[in-house]
């Protein structure tokens, strides 16, 4: 839907769109993509290329209880709030919101590359919450405890989390 070249899931699934793949898991396409990347970076090992990536602090997946009947309405409300915040030039923890991607919930991107995600679980009576900080583990926890958790706590339909950071 976004025209992304590649997509990756925590479960280990990966997807490549044209011109590399056909939109589904394909180990040979993944191997060819890695070999192509190494060919474009002569003299660098795969570990050298990995070290060049920025460090990110990503939370585990946190899932507050929310009934199947209520979860999509809750997510619609949260999407609307974040869209309004983004449209008004809003910020989260002092960082300007640069985008609110609303495919299957909302992923709010901040100016430093950090983000927060809220969506409905597709197969459980839960929401799915993930946060990522490009600054530190403490900042990752702050994105959850000072932004997402209080926003969801305003809704009586949202219950206890299965785990928290």
Locate the predicted segments by residue.
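Phosphate-binding and adjacent anionic-ligand microenvironments
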Residues: 1-165
